[in-house]
């Protein structure tokens, strides 16, 4: 293992503040999965352990636990910290059902939805003007699924052009829509989940060929975005289970 200089650590702290495209991963399972899927490009790993609990051929620095705590976003980080950037890939036409997140801002909701999408066979996720997928809370709440799915970040206009180019079918959730439990879907579709406070934007809603709703007892205005999106995805893919 290498011994870092004081300037090396200071530079990492500066990059943490200024370079929002960098990832600081402090969960061993998430690091292992991301490395295995080749969805990140690791720059180095810091650890307070005598040896890493997984194979890694890059630079490894032995540091005090306090250094990892200073660079981590969690209160009780594990003893391994991977500094990396996301691998770049070309946006491809979905081959399965897919999820569309329209300007969601809660990283916990986004992480939950990405994880659920993976479980439901929705292999593609389109994030339109959302919190960045490098967000540490998003990564933790997805339990690393953000590195195991095709997650694309783009603007609304870019997505609109993409939908029109590939003639994709979308559905969105609306209180005036049809009961999701009474519908069957016989083609590949994208499920649109809107902003926590404003719902689906007008531009994206116009692309949807159908609106659906989750029936609820009176007195409940709406469900959390993560909950409603999960229910809809499971219902659409129920025949797969």
Language model segments and positions:
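Boundary-proximal intrinsically disordered activation/regulatory segments immediately upstream
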Residues: 1-49, 130-131
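Short beta->alpha connector loops at strand-helix junctions that form conserved
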Residues: 63-64, 102, 128-129, 150, ...
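Active-site/ligand-binding-proximal alpha/beta "capping" segment
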Residues: 172-220
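Short acidic-hydrophobic, aromatic-tinged amphipathic segments that line or gate anion-handling sites
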Residues: 1-4, 25, 61-64, 149-157
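Glycine/small-residue-rich loop that forms an oxyanion/phosphate-binding "nest" at active or ligand-binding sites
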Residues: 60-85
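Active-site regions of enzymes building and remodeling cell-envelope glycoconjugates
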Residues: 55-66, 96, 187-190, 209
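Structured adenosyl-cofactor binding patch, chiefly the S-adenosyl-L-methionine
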Residues: 118-120, 138-145, 202-241
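RNA substrate-binding interface of SAM-dependent RNA methyltransferases
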Residues: 92-176
């Amino acid at each position: 293992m290498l011994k870092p200089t004081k300037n090396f650590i200071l530079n990492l702290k500066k990059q943490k503040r200024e370079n929002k495209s960098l990832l600081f991963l402090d969960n061993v399972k998430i690091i292992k999965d991301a490395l295995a899927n080749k969805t990140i490009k690791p720059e180095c790993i810091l650890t307070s352990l005598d040896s890493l609990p997984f194979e890694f051929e890059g630079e490894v620095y032995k540091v005090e636990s306090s250094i990892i705590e200073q660079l981590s976003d969690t209160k009780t980080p594990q003893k391994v910290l991977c500094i990396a950037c996301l691998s770049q890939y070309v946006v491809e036409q979905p081959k399965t059902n897919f999820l569309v997140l329209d300007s969601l801002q809660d990283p916990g909701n986004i992480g939950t939805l990405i994880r659920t999408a993976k479980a439901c066979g929705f292999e593609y996720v389109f994030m339109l003007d959302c919190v960045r997928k490098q967000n540490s809370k998003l990564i933790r709440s997805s339990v690393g699924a953000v590195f195991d799915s095709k997650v694309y970040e783009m603007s609304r206009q870019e997505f609109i052009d993409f939908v029109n180019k590939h003639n994709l079918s979308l559905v969105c959730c609306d209180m005036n829509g049809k009961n999701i439990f009474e519908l069957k879907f016989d083609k590949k579709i994208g499920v649109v989940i809107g902003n926590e406070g404003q719902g689906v934007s007008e531009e994206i809603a116009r692309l949807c060929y159908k609106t659906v709703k989750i029936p609820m007892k009176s007195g409940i205005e709406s469900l959390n975005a993560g909950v409603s999106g999960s229910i809809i995805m499971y219902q659409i893919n129920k025949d797969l289970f």
